[in-house]
Amino acid sequence: MHAIINGRIVLNDKVLDGCALMFDEKIKGIVSRETLDAAWENEKCWQGKPLALTDACGAYVSPGFINMHIHGCAGADTMDAKADTLEIMSRFLVQTGVTSFLPTTMTCEMQEIHKALEHIREAATVITRRRGGKPEALLDEQVTAPEAETQKYVPARGVQEDSFTMQSGLPDDKLARGKNILPGAKVLGAYLEGPFINNAYKGAQKEEQIKTADFAFIKDFADVIKVVVLAPETLEQAGKVKDFIARCKAHNIIVSLGHSAADYGTALQAIEAGASHVTHLCNAMTGLHHRQPGLLGAALDTGVTCELIADNLHIHPAVQRMIYRTKGADGLALITDSMRACGLAEGVSELGGQTVYVKNGAARLADGTIAGSVVTLNRAMANFRENTGATVPEVVRMVTENQAQELGLFEKIGSLSPGSAADITLFDENFTILYTFVDGREVYKNPEFR
C-alpha cells in the first residue's frame, strides 16, 4: 500500500489540502492526515498491508494526464512502426506527466497505416471484445502480476525498467492483454488522423495519399482505432456521411471533424449524425466569419469536445481565452499533436517523409507550413492556465476526465476515485513534473526534486 502525503490533491472542482491519497494498483481513497498518521504510528501499515510513503512537499497531486493526440516524441514517430517506437514514446511521456496516450497516425499508404496500427494493437491496454458479432469496447480487466516481496520504499530515478508482461491462459472471448506491457505511459488505442481529409486543409500531410472515407479501409482495425478524423464535405452525399459515422459509432470509434473545408451546415449535419469531437480547433479548418461560421463556428455552437494545441503558436493566447469562455473547461481537450522532435534539441527533423525544421519552438516544412508541435502536455497546461486564468482543477480536467469520459473509460482512468487505476501525476505550480505513477508503480521521479 502506498500513500502520498503533504500534497494538494486535485479533484474535479477543488483542491484538497491536509489529506493523503491511498493506492496500490488502484486508487483506494483519500483520508485525513490524522487518520494516516495514527495508522503509521501504531503499525506502519494500512489495512494490514505495509505502508510506503511519498512526500509531495506541497506539490499538486492529480490523475495521470491523457494525451489523446500525439504523433511522436523523443525521436520516435508512430508511423515508424518499429519494435521500440512505442516504448520510446512511453518512456518519455511519463516525464511530462502523461500516463495514457493514443499514438496518432497520419496520411500515408494504407499498408503503412495498417502496419502502425498493428504495432499499436500489440501495445494497447484497451481492446474490443465481440459478442455474437457485435463489438463492445472495454478496458480489459487487469491481470495482476505476481506480488513482489515487500521492500523498503526507495524512489526510483527515471523510468523503471521492469514492466508487467502479458499473461497466458486467458479466455478467448476476452483477448485480454494484461496490464501494461510498456515501461511507462499506457497505450489506449490509436488515433487515425488521415487519410480521410480535405487536400485543401491537409496541413503537413501527403496530398497524393488522401482518400475518400470508407469504413472498409479500417474495419480490420476497428478494435484498436479509438478516434478517426473526417472531413465530412469529402463524402458527396449526406447519406454517406451518416453511414460512415454510424458504422464508426457502432464500433465505439469517435468521429472527429478536422482537416476540413466544411461549411457550417455540413459540419452541423455531421455533428447531428454523431460526430462528437473536433481535431485541433482553429487549425486546418475553415475560419470563423460572421456570415460563414464554418466548422469552427459549428464546434463553438454545439456540445462537441474540441482539441486545443496550447503552444501559443497554433492558437494566439487571446483566441485561447475566447474559446475557453465559449466552450468552458468541460468542452475542451488539451493535446500536443507533437512530432518526433518533441523533447529533442532544435534542428532538422522528419515527419511522414518530409523534412521539418525546428526553430524557436516551432516545427515547420520548408514552405513554412506548421508540421505539428514540439510542446509537451504539461507545458501546454501551463500556457493555457496563464493565457486564460483557468483554475488548476479545470486545466487538469482538460487532460484527464474529459478524455476519459469521451473514450468511455472514466470508470477506469482519469480520476482519483476509488477503483480507478492508480495513474497519478505530481507537479508544482509551474506544471513541472515531479513524480509519475502508472498502475501504482513509480515510473518517473524528477532527479532535481529533493
Regions found by a protein language model. Name each.
Residues 1-42, 437:
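N-terminal metal-binding scaffold of metallo-dependent hydrolase/deaminase domains
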Residues 7, 405, 415-450:
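C-terminal cap of metal-dependent C-N hydrolases
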Residues 59-61, 68, 78-131, 141, ...:
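Alpha-helical scaffold segments that flank or form the walls of functional sites
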Residues 71, 87-119, 185-198, 222-233, ...:
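Divalent metal-dependent hydrolysis catalytic cores, especially in the metallo-beta-lactamase
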Residues 91-102, 199-224, 269-281, 292-305, ...:
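Active-site gating loops and adjacent loop-to-helix segments of metal-dependent hydrolytic enzymes
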Residues 219-344:
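Active-site core of metal-dependent hydrolases
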Residues 298-306, 324-420, 424-426:
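His/Asp/Glu-enriched, well-ordered alpha-helical/loop segment
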